[in-house]
């Protein structure tokens, strides 16, 4: 009886958190997290292959996409050694898909906000030798299940989704993983992919098959790009915790054990990262904190 009650409570918690994700976007169909700021970042195309150009691939759902308004401080002090490759055209700034720019936010799409990738990159260049440049490529879709990035399931995921979700996917020609892979291959012509950052899970909250699905996608990415897992770790950020007001915190117990399923995957704690009232997303300060934590873990793995 007690077990049945516990299972029912778990099911209801998972169901409610998934509903929270859909409800957020249904209520916020036109989001703009950098109103009035049309800063593209200086164009910074690498002249040729450089082994000291370290590249990181970033993917996931809305917290990787960036769901907090970019604040004045976030436009300041960005090193010319921290670059972003545009994953889509950004008409408001003139950024072009596949081109490199100084990493002025937004790093994902034209109207997205601050992401973990922002302060990941800033912290990396602050702690690496001056000879090393860091580049990020961010392809993320708000509301996405991890299955969106499984190309055997992408079409069905999109077909069975709400119109707002289809609109996000259309920015990537309905093939977000394919877009990320195409950009990654282009990036390999000028630098070395050193790691992959994932922040995803609200839509899949509590699903025990999630690690194996992540592993499938991670393995496919490595194989297609000719990379070895021991050289390219997967960093997986926790969701907003229960203590910090999150509604999808059940998934953190799964993320925290990701290393048991994928030996080269490492969880990134979100404890103490402030959250927004929607219970799904971090505040700008929360993104700054967790972004730094991604970097701190990567620096440890690089032995810096």
Task: Label every model-predicted segment.
Residues 1-20:
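Bacterial Sec-dependent N-terminal signal peptides
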Residues 19-304:
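Cell-envelope and extracellular/periplasmic
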């Amino acid at each position: 009886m007690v077990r049945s009650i516990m299972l029912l409570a778990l099911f209801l918690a998972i169901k409610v958190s998934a509903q929270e994700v859909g409800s957020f976007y249904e209520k916020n169909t036109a989001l703009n997290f950098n109103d009035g700021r049309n800063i593209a970042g200086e164009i910074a195309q690498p002249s040729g292959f450089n082994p000291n150009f370290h590249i990181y691939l970033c993917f996931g759902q809305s917290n990787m996409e960036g769901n907090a308004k970019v604040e004045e401080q976030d436009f300041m002090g960005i090193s010319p050694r921290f670059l972003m490759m545009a994953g889509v055209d950004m008409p408001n700034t003139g950024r072009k898909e596949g081109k490199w720019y100084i990493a002025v936010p937004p790093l994902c799409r034209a109207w997205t906000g601050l992401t973990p990738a922002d302060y990941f990159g800033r912290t990396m260049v602050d702690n690496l030798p001056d000879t090393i440049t860091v580049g990020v490529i961010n392809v993320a879709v708000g509301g996405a299940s991890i299955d969106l990035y499984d190309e055997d399931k992408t079409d069905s995921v999109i077909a069975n989704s709400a119109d707002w979700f289809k609109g996000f996917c259309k920015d990537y020609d309905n093939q977000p993983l394919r877009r990320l892979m195409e950009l990654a291959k282009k990036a390999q012509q000028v630098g070395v992919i050193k790691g992959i950052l994932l922040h995803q899970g609200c839509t899949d909250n509590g699903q025990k098959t999630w690690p194996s699905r992540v592993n499938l996608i991670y393995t496919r990415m490595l194989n297609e790009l000719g990379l070895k897992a021991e050289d390219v770790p997967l960093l997986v950020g926790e969701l907003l915790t229960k203590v910090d007001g999150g509604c999808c915190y059940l998934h953190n117990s799964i993320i925290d054990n990701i290393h048991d399923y994928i030996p080269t995957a490492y969880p990134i704690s979100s404890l103490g990262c402030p959250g927004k009232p929607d219970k799904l997303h971090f505040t700008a300060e929360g993104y700054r904190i967790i972004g730094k934590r991604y970097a701190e873990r990567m620096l440890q793995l690089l032995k810096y």
